[in-house]
């Protein structure tokens, strides 16, 4: 048989494996499998389809990865407790240095016994303080406000209004009648003016009479002197 008659043994052709991971692509630099929608690698930001002849690794990302790998674990919480306990131990030493007068002042402040504190709950104390504050403010308001003159105090009508836990009493007064007061004042003023006019006219008449009576006496005295 010649060379041409030889036949190559029949081999089954390689069939393409079913691509189970269609759409995913591996990065040529970091070999990370990215999704089909990604245009760049999600780790090293390398574009899809770049060659690996001269790979350009991002130095910042490498530094971050190294820092994460060799990052020191967070310190345990026991150290914090020790730090808190240290100043507590130092406090008694500082308290010893304080003069006894300061300690006496602190003891004098605690005059109220514990039994009284238990008897008076904080809610009642707050309510008493608020009531005292309201009474003080009401007293200051009453003292500062001037009283009205044209008001009859005899005619007073009170109206109580309650809003929640607060009750407000409103007092209404009527004005004084101005007609009688004005007429009496005008009469008294006119009578006073007439009296002033009469007194002024009487004083003028007395002055004239005194001047007339003084002149003839002077003349008579002069005539008597001449006769002598």
Curated annotation (Swiss-Prot):
Gene Ontology biological-process annotations: apoptotic process; chromatin remodeling; negative regulation of proteasomal ubiquitin-dependent protein catabolic process; negative regulation of transcription by RNA polymerase II; positive regulation of apoptotic process; positive regulation of DNA-templated transcription
Q: Where is this cross-link: Glycyl lysine isopeptide (Lys-Gly) (interchain with G-Cter in SUMO2)?
A: 77
Task: Quote the PTM field.
Answer: Monoubiquitinated.
Q: Which residue intervals make up region (Interaction with GABPB1 and FANK1)? A: 143-226
Chain positions found as Phosphoserine = 99, 123, 127, 130, 227
Q: What InterPro entries does the database record attribute to this sequence?
A: RYBP/YAF2, YAF2_RYBP, Znf_RanBP2, Znf_RanBP2_sf
Q: What is this protein called?
A: RING1 and YY1-binding protein
Q: What is the lineage of its organism?
A: Eukaryota, Metazoa, Chordata, Craniata, Vertebrata
Name of the gene this protein is made from: Rybp
